[in-house]
């Protein structure tokens, strides 16, 4: 209680607090973040970019006070959040680090334009955690990407282009996995399983390969914007190495070094992501070897 009063003195009477929740358990949040959330008059949990375990959310609520869930529309159209923030202190709780997603950077900028004070309390994010956890050099990661669910006949191949470009430059890739089959961000989330991710990879690969073959049949074949895509597609997809990272930063954390072909046989966890290694050094090879089945 004394800590909460101390934090309250440091905070504005009104405004918006972007509070990083870390990776999935109360004890993983910073003391500063917990105190700020407890000191707020209203607490909103942003539940569409990532999710916490329900039991940990219950523990957090016991610790800091009542929490209300909000989804994509409430964050992207923040009129209600701003209305509250004009006369009270509002904490928006975000899994990981609150500025990891541009959605929340945009919210921060819009609050500033509206004359609403906005404070940020950072947290551990999947980007900062997973690179070292799997045993790869953080300096050798390229742009990250997200595997999305297919919508009808539409399949996004942009993640494959990111993978190919990073691979061509000798850089590893972190691929986050979608948790919303509808793409609306309004609820009914179903985080991608390893099997879903493998199927998404195959759909992307098929579409990109068909496009490559069509280009080669043209009288004057056109070079792709990504010079590494065609060479990347020459690989055997099923043998492409991948590291499955499940429930990172929690007591259920697991890491498995496998291949795309064997990925669907893995159970994974509540939330999963993938790391695609590119060229690896000796220490990186040893680091990855720990996670192979039977190691």
Sequence positions of predicted segments:
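Class I S-adenosyl-L-methionine
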Residues: 2-117, 121
């Amino acid at each position: 209680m004394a800590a909460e009063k101390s934090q309250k003195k440091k905070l504005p009477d009104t405004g918006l607090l972007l509070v990083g929740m870390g990776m999935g358990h109360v004890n993983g949040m910073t003391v500063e973040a917990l105190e700020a959330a407890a000191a707020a008059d209203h607490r909103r949990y942003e539940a569409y970019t990532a999710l916490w375990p329900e039991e940990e959310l219950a523990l957090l609520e016991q610790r800091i006070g009542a929490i209300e869930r909000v989804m994509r529309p409430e964050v992207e159209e923040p009129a209600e959040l701003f209305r509250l923030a004009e006369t009270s202190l509002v904490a928006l709780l975000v899994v990981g680090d609150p500025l990891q997603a541009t959605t929340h950077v945009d919210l921060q900028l819009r609050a500033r334009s509206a004359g609403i004070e906005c404070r940020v309390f950072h947290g551990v994010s999947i980007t900062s955690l997973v690179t070292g956890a799997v045993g790869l050099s953080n300096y050798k990661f390229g742009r990250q990407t997200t595997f999305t669910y297919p919508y009808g006949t539409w399949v996004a191949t942009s993640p494959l282009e990111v993978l190919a470009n990073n691979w061509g430059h000798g850089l590893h890739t972190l691929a986050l996995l979608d948790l919303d089959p509808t793409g609306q961000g309004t609820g009914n989330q179903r985080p991608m399983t390893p099997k879903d991710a493998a199927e998404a990879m195959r759909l992307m690969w098929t579409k990109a390969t068909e496009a490559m073959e069509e280009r080669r049949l043209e009288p004057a074949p056109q070079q792709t914007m990504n010079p590494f895509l065609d060479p990347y597609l020459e690989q055997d997809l099923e043998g492409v190495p991948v590291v499955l990272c499940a429930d990172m930063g929690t007591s259920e954390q697991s890491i498995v070094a496998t291949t795309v072909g064997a990925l669907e046989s893995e159970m994974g966890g509540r939330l999963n992501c993938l790391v695609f290694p590119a060229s690896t050094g000796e220490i990186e090879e040893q680091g990855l070897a720990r996670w192979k089945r039977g190691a």
